[in-house]
Amino acid sequence: VSDFCGTCQKCMEICPTQALKSPRVLDANLCISYWTIESRKIPPTEVRKKMGDWLFGCDLCQTVCPWNQKIYKSKLEISEKRSLSESDRENLIQDLKFILESSNRQILKKIEKTPLMRAGPKGLKRNALIVIGNQKLVELKNQVQQKITDDFLGPLAKEILIELEN
C-alpha cells in the first residue's frame, strides 16, 4: 500500500481524543466516531469528557486530510471555535430534547434511511446525555432525570445529573 501521508500529521494533531497514536494507527477505544456510532456501550468517563458536542461521529481526521480535501477542490475550513452561539445552543437543546423525550419508534421514524440508524435510538439517547453533560445544558435536567430508571441509560443519567449540579 502506498504511503500518501509523508510527514503530514494533521489528523493526529486535530483528534480531540488522541485516538490516532501514530501515523495510520488508530485506537478505536478512544475514537469519537466509534463510540457515538458503532459501540453499544457507555464510553469511559475520560473519553466522554473529550466528546464535546459530538452527537454522531466526528471525522475531523478525514476533514483535515489534504487528500480528502482534493476531492472537494477547495480547502475545507475547520473552526477552532469550541463554543456554541446562542442560536446554535437553542437548536441543540431542541434536538436533544426531541431525542430524550421521544419513543424509540418516533426516533426510528425520524431517522429512517439515514446514517443515524447505525447508532439507533438507544445510541442517540446515550450520546444526547453525554452532550448535555459536556455542554452543561441545565435546561435539559428534567429530561436527564427521566432516564434514571432506564436499565441502560440510568447509570449515565445519574452521572450527568451530578455534572449538571457542579
Question: What are the roles of these predicted feature ranges?
Answer:
Residues 125-135, 155-164:
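Structural detector for internal amphipathic alpha-helices that build alpha-solenoid repeat scaffolds
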Residues 106-110, 136-148, 166:
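Amphipathic alpha-helical scaffolding segments comprising HEAT/armadillo-like alpha-solenoid repeats
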Residues 86-119:
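Flexible internal linker/loop segments at domain or repeat junctions
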